[in-house]
């Protein structure tokens, strides 16, 4: 029987399946951070259980960390306790930890791929909703809750039902300057922020195949924002070239054997998908969200839609509420809207390609008066590479702040946050009410669009700069 990529990876990991029970699958990689792991370690300790596979478990500090200092106490008492607890737990249970002073520290979904921990055909879990990022490599990766974190720690397995399958194809070539972030925002705008609920999505088509691994990670990162369980992209030569030579990737003959398997991980001809969505790449323009979920998005040169333009009554109600919260009006152009802050970073857009795109806009320009602009590399590795390329100097000369790695302003869990009423052009993945700080207003954009907003003081079409 013809199988999809998702079905191939899922079936290869079934440990036990009997009628009337949810399948039990094996987990190849478990990524851990300071926020969702303490109770899980406590659970092991309470039952006197060992960590089943410390060799398949990696930990880092990212959510709570300060991006201005390596001081573990800089983000407050709770953050300090969580990070110190993670360090103690990792020492007790034998887990590799990339702490604040380690050269591999970074956002967990940036760290995993750049170290070769993330590999095609593997199952990957983490107590974080954006674990879908790793699906860019053809892995089945998804976020789990704290009780599931404990289950994986104890057994290296997880109960998982089979999801429905959706293929989203972006056909044709993208126009100059259109990024992976624009692609995925356009997808969510078409499918809706709940349109993928119950599905594992495979992203396909010429435009997806033409993306770098960084771009593919951006797309899969936001699969969760259309409601999907996970997002996946079939591995190809681009994938292999990225993985080759990474620290934890296979080497030599083992790599050759792995590549042969990885290249078999694609949906078979005639494989059935429960849903199909098709977009034309030529129709995708630079995107900006106007509301309070990622599906409330338009092209930068379009007017904000009127709530009455939505056929669904719930969507109309949601649009009215969003416009009130965001202090925007139907018909208004976002290019007329001034911003207060810019955030370039997060597990969506903090990799080297993202920083290069932002620096290309910032070069020779200055951050607009009254705007605070932060650039937060996703890891120490990304930071080092960016500095080797001189990107930090470009940002600093333009008036951006060059920060230390961490989740930063993606979520109001550290010192980087919006004040009530402040408006932010952000390269992160969620624009929910209060996501970046109480009563803060978040607009999701690409790195280039964020940099353009920083230097113009308002949303700007990068095609016109």
From Swiss-Prot:
Q: In which pathway does it act?
A: Amino-acid biosynthesis; L-leucine biosynthesis; L-leucine from 3-methyl-2-oxobutanoate: step 2/4
User: Which residues does the record give as [4Fe-4S] cluster binding sites?
Assistant: 347, 407, 410
Biological process (GO), any one: L-leucine biosynthetic process
Q: Which SUPFAM superfamilies match?
A: Aconitase iron-sulfur domain
Origin superkingdom: Bacteria
Alphabetically, the GO molecular function entries are:
3-isopropylmalate dehydratase activity; 4 iron, 4 sulfur cluster binding; metal ion binding
- Please report a single Pfam family linked to this protein: Aconitase
Its EC number is: 4.2.1.33
Q: Where are the transmembrane segments?
A: none
Sorted alphabetically, which PROSITE patterns does this protein's record hold? Answer: ACONITASE_1, ACONITASE_2
Q: Which cofactor does it need?
A: [4Fe-4S] cluster
The answer, when asked if Transferase is one of the entry's keywords, is: no
Its keywords, alphabetically, are: 4Fe-4S, Amino-acid biosynthesis, Branched-chain amino acid biosynthesis, Iron, Iron-sulfur, Leucine biosynthesis, Lyase, Metal-binding
Q: Which InterPro entries match?
A: 3-IsopropMal_deHydase_lsu, Acnase/IPM_dHydase_lsu_aba_1/3, Acoase/IPM_deHydtase_lsu_aba, Aconitase_4Fe-4S_BS, Aconitase_4Fe-4S_dom, IPM_dehydratase_rel_enz, IPMI_cat
Q: Which reaction does it catalyse?
A: (2R,3S)-3-isopropylmalate = (2S)-2-isopropylmalate
This entry's comment on the bound cofactor is: Binds 1 [4Fe-4S] cluster per subunit.
Sum up the protein's function in the record's words: Catalyzes the isomerization between 2-isopropylmalate and 3-isopropylmalate, via the formation of 2-isopropylmaleate.
Quaternary structure note? Heterodimer of LeuC and LeuD.
Q: Which family does it belong to?
A: Belongs to the aconitase/IPM isomerase family. LeuC type 1 subfamily.
- The name this protein carries in UniProt is 3-isopropylmalate dehydratase large subunit
Ranked from the top, the taxonomy reads: Bacteria, Pseudomonadati, Pseudomonadota, Gammaproteobacteria, Aeromonadales
